[in-house]
Curated annotation (Swiss-Prot):
Protein name from the UniProt record: Short chain dehydrogenase/reductase AacuD
Gene3D superfamilies the record matches: NAD(P)-binding Rossmann-like Domain
Keyword Zinc-finger among record annotations: no
Organism of this sequence: Aspergillus aculeatus (strain ATCC 16872 / CBS 172.66 / WB 5094)
Biotechnological exploitation: Secalonic acids show unprecedented anticancer activities against various human cancer cells and might be interesting for further derivatization, targeting diseases such as cancer.
Record's keyword terms, sorted: NADP, Oxidoreductase
A UniProt-annotated Pfam family: adh_short
Matches recorded under InterPro entries: NAD(P)-bd_dom_sf, SDR_fam
Source organism phylogeny: Eukaryota, Fungi, Dikarya, Ascomycota, Pezizomycotina
EC number of this enzyme: 1.1.1.-
Similarity comment: family membership: Belongs to the short-chain dehydrogenases/reductases (SDR) family.
Primary role: Short chain dehydrogenase/reductase; part of the gene cluster that mediates the biosynthesis of the tetrahydroxanthone dimer secalonic acid D. The pathway begins with the synthesis of atrochrysone thioester by the polyketide synthase AacuL. The atrochrysone carboxyl ACP thioesterase AacuM then breaks the thioester bond and releases the atrochrysone carboxylic acid from AacuL. Atrochrysone carboxylic acid is decarboxylated by the decarboxylase AacuI, and oxidized by the anthrone oxygenase AacuG to yield emodin. Emodin is then reduced to emodin hydroquinone by a yet unidentified oxidoreductase.
């Protein structure tokens, strides 16, 4: 069992693996859509690219720093989904001018997935360097902030959807993660502001905790037996469901991929009555 299953949640059901409701009956229509995924060449980001490719979107743009994994991701996606155009950009999301240029080159983007992140060394707060703390906030907060600003300035005929891959560390004290947890909390609150201040319902912004997966980046910080690892298809299919028509009432909310979507839909009245429900903040 994952350590995260013990956290309080608004749904009775906790999924640790994907399920038919989001894997097969997600109601997302990918026809003609362009998806931009930062950090999309590996791990959760790559699994999200796979999920959207399965929905027959027109284009998937992957932004990541490492050319090798990026080329491998492109080749694998093209082999499995030859009708989907895969475009790649080797760039750091902290290069704000470059990211704005990528958006301009792509043209209309229907779904922006913010998955790129940095995790510092697992050390006490007294041992984290100023450079590590700065990097956590540069990559995890400022880069998504600038990218969403640039995205909102672009023109899209339909709905714009921002999906921010957050972390349970945003809502809890994660030992030896004094930079990572606060940076993810800050980014999630920034997304809540974009959602609350939106000029039109044609913009939807979501943040969600993806789960625990033994990816190469996670292996740099955790042992294989440190927790119960989960199905990486779960956050991918949940992200795709968020991009569909059923999730609009959850605009601005912080969610978990593990929460059953039909049970979330059953909470719609409460969500619409209480603007603070399912957000990062103080509950008394």
């Amino acid at each position: 069992m994952s350590k995260f299953e013990a956290f309080l949640r608004p749904t009775q059901t906790y999924h640790s693996r994907t399920y038919d409701r989001i894997s097969k009956h997600h109601n997302f229509n990918g026809t003609g859509k362009t998806i931009l995924v930062t950090g999309g060449s590996s791990g959760v980001g790559y699994s999200i690219c796979q999920a959207f490719a399965e929905a027959d979107v027109a284009r998937i743009a992957i932004v990541s720093r490492s050319p090798g994994p990026q080329a491998a991701a492109k080749a694998a996606l093209e082999a499995a989904h030859p009708a989907v155009q895969i475009v790649t950009y080797a760039a750091s999301i902290t290069d704000h001018a470059r990211m704005a240029a990528i958006l301009a080159e792509l043209g209309p983007v229907d779904v922006l997935v913010l998955c790129a992140a940095v995790v510092h060394r697992q050390v006490p707060a007294t041992a984290i360097t100023a450079a590590e703390m700065q990097a956590a906030f540069d990559v995890n907060v400022l880069a998504p902030f600038h990218l969403v600003q640039a995205y909102l300035a672009t023109t899209t005929a339909g709905t714009k959807t921002v999906i921010h891959v957050s972390s349970a560390a945003a809502q809890s004290r994660s030992p030896f993660r004094a930079g990572y947890g606060p940076s993810k909390a800050a980014a999630t609150q920034v997304m809540q502001h974009f959602a609350a201040e939106r000029a039109s319902p044609a913009l939807r912004v979501f943040s969600f905790h993806p789960g625990a997966f033994y990816t190469p980046s996670v292996a740099e910080h955790y042992a294989p037996d440190s927790t119960g690892w989960e199905d990486i298809n779960l956050p991918a299919h949940f992200a795709r469901w968020l991009a569909g028509p059923e999730s609009g009432f959850l605009n601005g909310r912080y969610l978990w991929a593990h929460w059953d979507v039909d049970e979330l839909i059953a909470l719609r009245d409460r969500v619409e009555r209480d603007s603070s429900f399912l957000t990062i903040g103080l509950v008394v």
